[in-house]
């Protein structure tokens, strides 16, 4: 008898889709991956039935079976809109569990140290990393969800490896490979 293929729904934005990261994740896990993404999307949009993406996500959670649903918030959303991030994370995790799936937070990273984007954001690298770390871990703790802490991995590697695209915000191909590896490790254990 053939083993059932793992099914993963990814909810996010360009940090999820950059460099075809879901394909990298599929290669590492053998899973079928469906993505509901839009550049700049926030988790709140995934819950809004009045948006095209929200309608698709809510229908997918109601009508399809998933093993894991991966949640990725807009790049600085966990800091700039923390209360909204936590509230929407809780609502999504509830819907994910009703589906029988496991929620997984894909915790993203601080903008590149010394980069224009970080300078414009008005926060130091270590401070942004710490605030992102705290927000994602708070969301995971509150919802008893898994966490793929990519932000921590970027923080550990950033002094020795370039993981960022030229904008100092998105991952380059190496960065996306790290994303896929960190998520795969969480899903496979």
Task: Give residue spans per PLM region.
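Conserved SGNH/GDSL esterase-like catalytic core that processes O-acyl groups on lipids
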Residues: 5-11, 15-90
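Stable alpha-helical elements in mature extracytoplasmic
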Residues: 21, 53, 57, 85-92, ...
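General small-molecule cofactor/ligand-binding pocket signal
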Residues: 34-36, 104, 146-148
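Serine-dependent acyl-ester chemistry module
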Residues: 68, 74-77, 81, 111-131
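A short helix->loop->beta-strand "cap" motif at the edges of active sites that frequently abuts
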Residues: 94-104, 145
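Early exported N-terminus immediately downstream of N-terminal targeting peptides
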Residues: 100-103, 108-111, 121
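Catalytic His-Asp segment of secreted/periplasmic serine-dependent ester chemistry enzymes
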Residues: 116-117, 121-189
């Amino acid at each position: 008898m053939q083993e059932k293929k793992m099914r993963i729904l990814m909810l996010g934005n360009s940090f999820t889709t950059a460099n075809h990261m879901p394909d990298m994740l599929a290669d590492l896990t053998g899973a079928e991956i469906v993505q509901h993404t839009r550049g700049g999307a926030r988790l709140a949009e995934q819950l809004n039935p009045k948006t095209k993406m929200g309608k698709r996500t809510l229908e997918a959670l109601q009508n399809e079976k998933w093993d894991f649903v991966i949640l990725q918030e807009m790049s600085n959303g966990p800091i700039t809109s923390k209360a909204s991030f936590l509230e929407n994370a809780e609502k999504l995790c509830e819907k994910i569990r009703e589906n029988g799936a496991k929620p997984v937070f894909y915790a993203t990273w601080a903008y590149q140290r010394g980069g224009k984007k970080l300078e414009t954001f008005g926060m130091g690298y270590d401070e942004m990393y710490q605030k992102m770390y705290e927000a994602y871990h708070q969301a995971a703790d509150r919802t008893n969800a898994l966490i793929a802490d990519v932000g921590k991995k970027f923080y550990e590697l950033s002094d020795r490896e370039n993981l960022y695209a030229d904008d100092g915000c998105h991952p380059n191909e190496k960065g996306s490979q790290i994303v896929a590896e960190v998520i795969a490790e969480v899903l496979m254990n």
